[in-house]
C-alpha cells in the first residue's frame, strides 16, 4: 500500500472515533464518498465506516435495505462488490429474486479539484423480469472509482471492484420517503369498526318520522316502531336495545298515568283545556 493510500485510511479511521453532537447527519457530497470512503475500501477490504453498511445487492430487495443500513432516515449507504455477469466482461448482474436494477440516464463525472476521481450511475428498481418489469419508486446511486483512481490504476491487492450505493425511495413530487413511513411494524391509526354514519337524507327522514310521536301507544306497538326506525336510521346503536326501550316505556307510562289522573272523567282528544292546541308529545327524542 502506498503512502497516500495509507494516510487516507488513517485519516478515515481517526474520523471513526469523533464524537459528533446530537443533530448531525451523515450527508456526504459525491466527492467525499469517493475520496474518504470508497477509495480506502478499495485499498483495504477490511476498512469499515460507521455510517456505511455492507451488503450483497443481488440477495436483498430494495424495500429490505433500510433495515440493513447502519444509519439513515431517508437514504441509506452500502459498500457492495459489483457482480460481473462474465469473468472477462464488463456487464454487471443487477438482478434480485423479485426484480432488477436498471440504469437510467447518463453517468455523472465526479471531480476532486480538476481531477476526475469517480462516476455516479443512477438506477431504478423494476419488479419482475425484463422486458416486462414494472417500474418502482426505488432509486439507487452507484459510485465507482474513475480517472486516476480507476481500478486499472490500483495495486493488485485491490482485486474486488467495490462500489458505494446510496438507496432511497422517491415520491412523485421528488421528495424522499422517510424510514418511519416504510416500517411495517409501526401501528398506524386505522378507522375503528363503528357503524357508518347516516347521510343527510337518512337523518332528515329519521328526524321527520320521530319529531312528533303519538302520546298514547301500547308497549308492543311502540317497541316494534322503535326497532323498525332504528334499522332505518342508527342501526342497533341505541333504540333496539331492550333495556333502553323498557326504561323509556316506563317513563312514558308514568307520565301518561299522571295525565290520566289529571283528566280523569274527561274524554281526551289530544287538545288542551281551550280545545284549540295540540299537546306536545310526552316522549319526543
Swiss-Prot record:
Main location: nucleus
GO function terms (MF aspect): DNA-binding transcription factor activity; protein homodimerization activity; sequence-specific DNA binding; transcription cis-regulatory region binding
CC annotations in GO: nucleus
Induction (record text): High levels during senescence (e.g. age-, salt- and dark-related). By salt stress in an ethylene- and auxin-dependent manner. Induced by H(2)O(2). Accumulates in response to abscisic acid (ABA), ethylene (ACC) and auxin (NAA). Repressed by high auxin (IAA) levels. Age-related resistance (ARR)-associated accumulation. Repressed by miR164.
Alphabetical UniProt keywords: Activator, Apoptosis, DNA-binding, Nucleus, Transcription, Transcription regulation, Ubl conjugation
Residues in coiled coil: none
Pfam families: NAM (PF02365)
The keyword Zinc is annotated on this UniProt entry: no
Compartments where found: Nucleus
DNA-binding region: 117-176
UniProt cross-references to PANTHER family, sorted A to Z: NAC DOMAIN-CONTAINING PROTEIN 92, PROTEIN CUP-SHAPED COTYLEDON 2-RELATED
Domain notes: The NAC domain includes a DNA binding domain and a dimerization domain.
Role this protein plays: Transcription activator that binds to DNA in promoters of target genes on a specific bipartite motif 5'-[ACG][CA]GT[AG](5-6n)[CT]AC[AG]-3'. Promotes lateral root development. Triggers the expression of senescence-associated genes during age-, salt- and dark-induced senescence through a regulatory network that may involve cross-talk with salt- and H(2)O(2)-dependent signaling pathways. Also regulates genes during seed germination. Positively regulates aging-induced cell death. Involved in age-related resistance (ARR) against Pseudomonas syringae pv. tomato and Hyaloperonospora arabidopsidis.
Record note on quaternary structure: Forms homodimers. Interacts with GLK1 and GLK2. Interacts with NLA.
Name of the featured protein: NAC domain-containing protein 92
Species the sequence originates in: Arabidopsis thaliana
